[in-house]
A protein has these predicted regions:
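Conserved AMP-binding/adenylate-forming core of the ANL superfamily
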Residues: 33, 37, 57-109, 126-131, ...
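Conserved adenylate-forming
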Residues: 86-88, 207-226, 230-272, 284, ...
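Conserved C-terminal "lid"/linker of ANL adenylate-forming enzymes
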Residues: 184, 479, 505-511, 519-523, ...
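Structural core segment of the AMP-binding/adenylate-forming
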Residues: 2-10, 116-202, 526
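Conserved AMP-binding/adenylation subdomain of ANL enzymes
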Residues: 251-269, 279-319, 329, 333
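AMP-binding/adenylate-forming catalytic core of the ANL superfamily
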Residues: 125-132, 142-144, 320, 431, ...
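Gly/Ser/Thr-rich phosphate-binding loop
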Residues: 202-206, 317-322, 331-395, 408, ...
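Conserved ATP/PPi-binding loop(s) of AMP-dependent carboxylate-activating enzymes
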Residues: 402-406, 417-448, 484-486, 581
Length: 634
């Protein structure tokens, strides 16, 4: 039998699979009486431009650009016809390499209109990483500014495509020996002409009447199940994998994210300091806003805490997005108190474990009474679990929420067995949101997605009796100390209770006797400079298990924590830096790690869930998010 728990009134329900048995399995299915959409990204842009043509869709504060839905649609059509004029067709891959700019949005929706596939390229990539990105998916056209911050994009392209500098200025057609699919380089700079590069401002003027007719024909042929976006994802280590997402994947995920957040109910102005190249920015941000006819505010080309605070104040933003690190930097900015945040009533926190103390501050100081936590991965378009606004605040931050509508999820052991609720295992997801594949990586796709379409997230989670899930860590981040399993998130959550700790990250470092021991990176508040390592250990003694107390404590500054562009901490880099700083590079454990409470073999063969038959549609990492177990309100 099923027990169905309403979400948001009568809009959707959760199946808790409460079979008449003593042990309930860690499986949920997001039943819903709201149908999936069968639209393309282009369909939704045209619908928005028809319904609210004069409403502002995107605001880029730093560049002084404000565009309505009708204006964006017009610009997207000009951009698409320009690409068609250059010879691009349906299915061709178009790389977008750069920070948050209006041209990024035009590329996102313009390529979707024409049935082309946009490839998101990390703004921090250097020449070797760009080379891999171009080769892996066969990019035909690349769009980028001349550079950003310390990166010289034009020099990087010239480095891997030397033919570039042999071309005339302002001419971007290309035939490269190293990149046989590559044909055009388009540069976003009106002030200067570059050898081997078209000016973006010229490309959007190239389209002829014949090109416009062809665009209309191409648009009619685009299907919801066609790929629309390739997002390179490797978590925080390893070679990038091209997660291939369809219109159906991202349109529906954005739609149900917005419904659960209440965007379909009232006017919403979303502050998006997150990078557009990441799912948080381009699916939860721009596409979500488009589908629900709302407005996105982009404070700066990349995250700047002061710019975000100013944007909230000046644009009267109602919702703010961010990772915990972003919110910490915003709340602790010396000019934080200068601005008015009374317009804010909601926000999304995702990207890393969210400390209870931070959640409390977001509600009490920034006004996020409808704060919601999200969990998912790029491969799931991205959100799989999300808080429900009807839950009390203290319940919302105990977990990553409920399964999204129309999705299934299970927690399994290392052999694929669905575990009882309350036991830790790997989180699996199945449904419309699961990516099509990793582009041109059949073996890798088979490793991550089982034949019956269960996607292995690589995250360790526990399902509670009410069907919500808490993420306790990544399989690869698990610390095994003499057979005892230590989940970094648990130690981090405890240490965050210390009133003088502003940020903390836990990693494992090698130890001869135990195999691994705990190392803590700690950032103290300004007034806490006299705190010692022993003070931290004393804070832990008698409150957490002795084997979880950090052996090593490294006090760090704000800039010392290595972050990805999307705000995730690079734990693998922290581990390596810790070993060097502590002189542990040559340490070899004298014993093999033995199985403790529950140990994962990261390389183990992956299995679909077994022991229990899981039914459902086989249709078909942004966020490693969790919260603690304290109450939000004391």
């Amino acid at each position: 039998m099923h027990i169905e728990t309403p979400l948001n009134g009568d809009e959707s329900v959760l199946s808790e699979n409460a079979a008449a048995q003593p042990i309930r399995k860690s499986y949920v299915h997001g039943l819903s009486n709201v149908a999936l959409l069968f639209d393309t990204v282009g369909d939704r842009l045209r619908m928005a431009a028809d319904q609210v043509p004069n409403r502002e869709f995107v605001i880029f504060k730093r560049d002084g650009i404000r565009k309505t839905y009708q204006q964006l649609l017009h610009d997207c059509e000009k951009f698409a016809t320009g690409l068609i004029h250059l010879g691009l067709d349906r299915g061709d891959r178009v790389g977008m390499w750069g920070p948050n700019t209006y041209e990024w949005i035009v590329c996102q929706f313009g390529t979707a209109l024409a049935g082309m596939i946009m490839v998101n390229i990390n703004p921090s990539y250097q020449s070797e990483e760009l080379k891999f990105a171009l080769e892996k998916v066969g990019i035909k056209a690349l769009i980028a500014p001349p550079g950003f911050k310390k990166s010289n994009y034009y020099a990087s392209v010239s480095d891997i495509i030397p033919e570039l500098i042999l071309k005339p200025e302002g001419r971007g057609e290309m035939s490269s020996h190293n990149f046989p699919n590559f044909r055009h380089f388009i540069i976003i700079d009106d002030q200067k002409a570059y050898r081997g590069a078209w000016k973006y401002s010229e490309v959007i003027k190239m389209g002829s009447e014949e090109d416009r007719i062809k665009l209309a024909d191409m648009e009619r042929q685009v299907q919801p199940d066609d790929p629309v976006n390739i997002q390179y994802t490797s978590g925080t280590t390893g070679f990038p994998k091209g997660a291939t997402l369809t219109h159906h994947n991202v349109v529906n995920n954005a739609y149900f994210i917005g419904r659960r957040a209440g965007y379909s109910e009232k006017r919403t102005i979303i502050c998006v300091p997150n990078p557009l190249y990441h799912c948080f920015g381009c699916v939860m941000g721009s596409l979500n806003a488009c589908i629900h006819l709302q407005t996105c505010v982009f404070p700066a080309p990349s995250f700047e805490p002061l710019a975000a605070l100013q944007a909230i104040h000046e644009e009267r933003c109602t919702t703010v997005y961010g990772t915990p690190t972003m919110f910490i930097d915003m709340l602790n900015h010396p000019r934080y108190s200068e601005f008015d945040y009374s317009s804010v009533f909601s926000g999304f926190v995702a990207g890393a474990p969210c400390p209870i103390a931070l959640c409390r501050r977001l509600v009490q100081e920034l006004g996020m009474r409808d704060l919601q936590v999200c969990y998912g991965t790029t491969e799931t378009s991205p959100v799989s679990y999300m808080s429900v606004r009807d839950d009390p605040p203290e319940e919302r931050i105990k977990s990553v929420g409920h399964i999204m509508d129309h999705l299934e999820s299970a927690i399994v052991g290392n052999d694929g067995t669905v575990l009882p609720r309350g036991e830790r295992g790997e989180v699996l997801v199945r449904g419309y949101s699961v990516m099509r594949c990793y582009w041109d990586s059949e073996d890798m796709t088979k490793t991550e997605i089982t034949p019956d379409r269960w996607y292995h997230t690589g995250d360790i989670g526990v399902m509670h009796e009410n069907g919500t899930v808490s993420i306790v860590g990544r399989k690869k981040d698990l610390i095994v100390r003499g057979g005892e399993n230590i989940y970094p998130t648990e130690v981090e959550q405890y240490l965050f209770r210390h009133p003088k700790i502003e940020d903390v990250q836990i990693v494992g470092v090698p130890d001869e006797r135990y195999g691994e021991v705990v190392c803590a990176w700690i950032r103290l508040s300004e007034e806490a400079k006299n705190i010692t390592e022993q003070d931290i250990r004393d804070f832990c003694k008698g409150r957490i298990a002795h084997f979880k107390i950090p052996r090593y404590i490294l006090f760090k500054g704000e800039k010392d924590f290595p972050l990805t562009v999307s705000g995730k901490v690079k734990k693998y880099e922290m581990r390596e830096r810790s070993k060097i700083e502590l002189g542990l590079q040559q340490v070899k454990p004298r014993i093999d790690h033995f199985n403790g409470e529950w140990t994962f073999d990261v390389q183990a063969e992956r299995h679909p869930p077994k022991e229990q038959k899981l039914n459902g549609e086989n249709t078909g990492r942004l966020f490693d998010v969790t919260a603690g177990v304290e109450s939000l309100v004391q």
